Amino acid sequence: MSAHGDPIPMTAHPSGPLSGTAQVPGDKSISHRSLILGALAVGETKVTGLLEGQDVLDTARAMQAFGAEVIQHAPGAWSVHGVGTGGFAEPEDVIDCGNSGTGVRLIMGAMATTPITATFTGDASLRSRPMGRITDPLAGFGTTAVGRRGGRLPMTLTGAADPVPVRYTVPVPSAQVKSAVLLAGLNAPGQTVVIEAEATRDHSERMLRGFGAEISVESAPEGNVITLTGQPELRPQTIVVPRDPSSAAFPVAVGLIVPGSDVLVPGIGLNPTRAGLYTTLQEMGAELSFENMREEGGEPVADLRARFSDAMQGIEVPPERAPSMIDEYPILSVIAAYATGRTVMRGVKELRVKESDRIDAMARGLEACGVRVEEDEDTLIVHGMGPGGVPGGATCASHLDHRIAMSFLCCGLAAQTPVSVDDGGPIATSFPIFEPLMTALGATLTRDST
């Protein structure tokens, strides 16, 4: 359902060629971090291009609850008057993070070494997700956490009064875990060290450095060793948020799979730790080009152009690529359904603990649309049916997951018959303009009466 309402059933109808320019919203990962680091800096941080989806708005409200002044001046233009490292005030009420796993986990890290108590909750999807992967390393600083059985929300954290730095090896590749530990390390004396065997998105490291933290990243036999020196005074910044590569995946996808389409998606952040999908699509033979390559705010940026691709071939996606495209496997599985041959996605068990069990959700939905799918705990295999080969005609469960809902709506635009989702409401968490943006390209999306 929508963040605070009834389900919004939606249907995507087979559409003619899609064309035009798709201005997708600002990057969700960078938007969350801009607000949180701005709240931990001393002075005014200015942000333009902020994603104003429900997830990020929930983080903005949380920063206000912890004592920062967060102001929207115009669409996408915000300022944050920070309280300094260790300056968070104790919230008077429960912190509701809605659907956002990123938001709740980063905020837990940011408050973990300040001697205050806060209670966190979220929607039904977020309350089902495990938080032990965050609270376990935070306990090393001296933070205590009490939640529901299985380490689930609602959960109350009490920050460490006398935090000690930690040395932590991330057991499963996760930028959220890494970032939570680094944010906690900001208010711990000495050096906090995070070791990750596989590189994950590095926005936190880049942005911490930009805000004035002393942070280094070194390669070692065990992986990336990230060292943060605690208790800096973070300097406020002026941030221009690049457009979200995860959101861009949806207009790119329909450009590739709807016959005759030609879609331009400008200003997309192409951080190497986020660009795995686009590398994969090129390997499949997609008509995908990168134009006007440039750097903005320390992040590589380009305009993406996606044209209908009738010669895409299924491939084996290297499992080591998973951290750089973990959010894009749902839409990749749809694109794979319109390729020829098998697309094998291994090393994706992390998908089972996202907003939904995304492996199961995509497998069941694609099967309902007439696509042959195989899965095990760590693998998803899609047997492509070629251009225009997906029968469609199904209603797919979104499981309160924005990416599942958008993926199946994209599927329906290229299928032989319409594809519906039981609830398009969660799309607002990350991509509130998805529906008008797709419609402007020529897509036919309808909201169905319940």
Curated annotation (Swiss-Prot):
GO biological process, one term: chorismate biosynthetic process
UniProt binding sites for 3-phosphoshikimate: 28-29, 33, 174, 176, 327, 354
The protein's enzyme class: transferase
Coiled-coil intervals: none
The enzyme's E.C. designation: 2.5.1.19
Stretch list, region Disordered: 1-26
KW Amino-acid biosynthesis (keyword) present: yes
Entry keywords, A to Z: Amino-acid biosynthesis, Aromatic amino acid biosynthesis, Cytoplasm, Transferase
Record field: catalytic activity: 3-phosphoshikimate + phosphoenolpyruvate = 5-O-(1-carboxyvinyl)-3-phosphoshikimate + phosphate
Pfam families: EPSP_synthase
Residues that bind phosphoenolpyruvate: 28, 101, 129, 176, 358, 403
Name of the protein in its database record: 3-phosphoshikimate 1-carboxyvinyltransferase
